[in-house]
Amino acid sequence: MSIFISPSNNTGWGLRAPSKMYGGAXQRSTQHPVRVRGHFRAPWGALKGRVRSRTTVDDVIDQVVADARNYTPAAAPVSTVDAVIDSVVSDARRYARAKSRRRRIARRHRSTTAMRAARALLRRARRTGRRAMLRAARRAASGASAGRTRRRAATAAATAISSMSRPRRGNVYWVRDXATGVRVPVRTRPPRT
């Protein structure tokens, strides 16, 4: 004859697993209470869960959360004196940077004595070229009845001078003049000897 014992924690009938008696504890205590019912269980055929209607408290909480999410801190009032000082300092720094950059560029492209001599020669040529052009123009204006050859020579001289004064791209070769012994800048490449 078998004896049926009903345990108090509703795990089933009999003493199949004594360890399951009080939720794993050997004996019931305040530190390890037995959980009888965990959650609300609706009867079969009822709705899946309780539908709770929204309350005013829910709306207030939602509004507070939305405000916190969209919060942007107000900009601190900017002092006009500070702004003026900052702008003056930044302008001074920019000016100093530009000045040092100009100095660096000037140092990088410092001209040699040969380059300075070439520039002086070109300046002199331009000056004399302008004078010659003016002279040729005066001659052409005064001697309108002058011969065709003179007019042609004047225009040729004027074009040569203008082409000489116009800055041209290309190489400049320094050649020693046989008569004077001075180095002269020339555009055409000297023959190799």
Swiss-Prot record:
The record marks G24, A25 as: Cleavage. The modification N-acetylserine is found at S2. Induction: Expressed in the late phase of the viral replicative cycle. Residues 2-24 form a propeptide. It comes from the Viruses. InterPro entries: Adeno_VII. The keyword Glycosyltransferase does not apply. Transmembrane segments: none annotated. One of its GO terms (biological process) is symbiont entry into host cell. The keyword 4Fe-4S does not apply. Keywords: Acetylation, DNA-binding, Host nucleus, Host-virus interaction, Late protein, Phosphoprotein, Viral penetration into host nucleus, Virion, Virus entry into host cell. GO terms for cellular component: host cell; host cell nucleolus; viral capsid. A motif (Nuclear localization signal) lies at residues 183-193. The modification N6-acetyllysine is found at K48. Cleaved near the N-terminus by the viral protease during virion maturation to form the mature protein. The modification Phosphothreonine is found at T55. GO terms for molecular function: DNA binding. Belongs to the adenoviridae histone-like nucleoprotein family. Plays a role in the inhibition of host immune response within the nucleus. Interacts with cellular nucleosomes and immobilizes the host immune danger signal HMGB1 on chromatin. In turn, prevents HMGB1 release out of the cell and thus decreases inflammation. Also plays a role in the wrapping and condensation of the viral DNA. May also promote viral genome import into the nucleus. All late proteins expressed from the major late promoter are produced by alternative splicing and alternative polyadenylation of the same gene giving rise to non-overlapping ORFs. A leader sequence is present in the N-terminus of all these mRNAs and is recognized by the viral shutoff protein to provide expression although conventional translation via ribosome scanning from the cap has been shut off in the host cell. Interacts with the core-capsid bridging protein; this interaction bridges the virus core to the capsid. Interacts with host NPM1; this interaction might play a role in placing the pre-histone-like nucleoprotein on the viral DNA or regulating viral gene expression. Interacts with host HMGB1; this interaction inhibits host immune response. This is Pre-histone-like nucleoprotein. The gene is L2.
